[in-house]
Design a protein with these regions (language model features):
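Short, highly charged, low-complexity non-transmembrane loops/tails of multi-pass membrane proteins
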Residues: 203-226
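Membrane-interface helix-boundary motifs at transmembrane edges
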Residues: 67-79, 131-139
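Membrane-interface transmembrane-helix boundary segments in multi-pass integral membrane proteins
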Residues: 4, 47, 161-197
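Non-cytosolic membrane-interface motifs at loop->transmembrane helix junctions
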Residues: 36-44, 75-78, 102-115, 138-140, ...
Length: 226
């Protein structure tokens, strides 16, 4: 299972890095052509939750291959669970809300497919294969911190440039629709986080039972040989 987890992490690392670099090239080039400065174009690129979530997944995958002690925190199940929750959210929000609003063109299609479907699927697959059943419900509280910080960043940026990256976060929607949308996203995030924790516990327990069964089978086989 450990080897399979590393293979999946490697696939997530390669595909995620490729799509992030390609999307960076597309976004920054188009943004600067539209009159933004280089700094403004880069900030615009990083204003999307999809990009930040994929960066988190990329770092989580990369940490699995680097032996440095200071990266141990990035290899914890809690950090992996936070990245997995964010990536599953990316896939769900995109497929349910954003994708129906418009189809990307050209190279952006490839980036959209990888960043919104392939990398989230690989992240979830890695989470299941590497499950240990040791993630606590308390971890969910910490998993809510990054999206809360992101939300603060969105509106601090909006205060200065009057622009948000996602239409359902636009203050122009009106207070009621905006707050309803934010509440819905928070509720979906909490539900997704609980699902991620439940999957870890369920698969972890199943692995434990299989391990005990194999140990018992080996022990019984040795006794018969005696």
């Amino acid at each position: 299972m450990k080897t399979l987890a590393l293979i999946i992490a490697g696939l997530g690392l390669v595909s995620g890095a490729f799509a992030l670099v390609l999307q960076y090239s597309i976004t920054v080039t188009e943004a600067m052509a539209g009159g933004r400065s280089l700094a403004g174009a880069v900030l615009f690129y990083f204003s999307f939750f999809t990009i930040l979530a994929n960066c988190a997944a990329l770092i989580s995958h990369l940490a699995q291959f680097l032996p440095f002690k200071f990266l141990d925190v990035l290899r914890t199940r809690s950090v992996g669970g936070a990245a997995t929750t964010a990536m599953v959210m990316v896939a769900m929000v995109y497929s349910l809300i954003l994708a129906p609003q418009g189809a990307p063109q050209g190279e952006s299609v490839l980036c959209d497919v990888i960043l919104h479907y392939i990398t989230p699927t690989l992240m979830l697959a890695w989470w299941l294969v590497s499950a240990k059943g040791k993630v606590s419900l308390q971890s969910l509280v910490w998993w809510l911190v990054p999206p809360a910080v992101y939300l603060a960043f969105v509106y601090i940026r909006w205060f200065f440039v009057q622009e948000v990256s996602n239409p359902f976060l636009d203050p122009a929607l009106g207070q009621y629709r905006l707050l309803s949308g934010i509440f819905g996203i928070v509720l979906l995030f909490v539900t997704t986080g609980l699902m991620v924790i439940l999957l870890d516990k369920s698969v972890g327990k199943l692995k434990g039972r299989q391990g005990r069964y194999r140990s018992s089978a080996r022990y019984a086989s040795r006794r018969r040989l005696r």
